[in-house]
């Protein structure tokens, strides 16, 4: 099945995605950091709050939604469909161990974006048959901010992923 992603998002809106959480902000507030990133050219924001309670995560998501909606910048919520729906976010991003894509798509409104993390070329190929709007190729390089990752793809791996799918890659 080919994703009707063109109806939900333009690839240009995914050209520079900020993936952040409140812990990455240091002394500054999350909205302050996100606003500065958008002013610097960020075209999409993914909120990851792995350590926050549901209440706190929802409050942060709503604050970012209020900031981003007037600017036309999509807000994607990491892992939590419930938070994405309650905050009226533009989408949700799921990893390999999260809810299956088909189940998520059944729950989500048809206009809501669905991103999926891929860690191997086989997963990229499998994604061609899934109703996802974009793929998160993770990680391209080693990172200290996320330690539970597969080995880095590197630039050659990223190039290979690009050849395996027409879906937008982030």
PLM-predicted stretches and their roles:
Residues 170:
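Conserved active-site loop/cleft motifs that coordinate metal ions or position small ligands
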Residues 141-143:
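A short, flexible beta-alpha/helix-coil linker loop
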């Amino acid at each position: 099945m080919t994703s009707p992603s063109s109806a939900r998002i333009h690839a240009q809106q995914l050209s520079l995605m900020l993936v952040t959480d409140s812990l990455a902000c240091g002394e500054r507030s999350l909205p302050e950091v996100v606003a500065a990133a958008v002013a610097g050219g960020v075209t999409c924001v993914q909120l990851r709050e792995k350590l926050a309670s549901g209440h706190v995560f929802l409050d942060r998501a709503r604050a970012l939604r209020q900031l981003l909606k007037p600017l036309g910048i999509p807000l994607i919520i990491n892992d939590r469909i419930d938070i994405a729906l309650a905050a009226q976010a533009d989408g949700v991003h799921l990893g390999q161990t999260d809810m299956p894509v088909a189940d998520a798509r059944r729950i989500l409104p048809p206009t809501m974006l669905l991103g999926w993390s891929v860690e191997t070329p086989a997963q990229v190929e499998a994604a061609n048959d899934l109703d996802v709007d974009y793929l998160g190729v993770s990680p391209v390089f080693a990172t200290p901010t996320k330690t539970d990752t597969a080995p880095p793809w590197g630039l050659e791996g990223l190039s290979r992923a690009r050849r395996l799918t027409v879906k937008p890659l982030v």
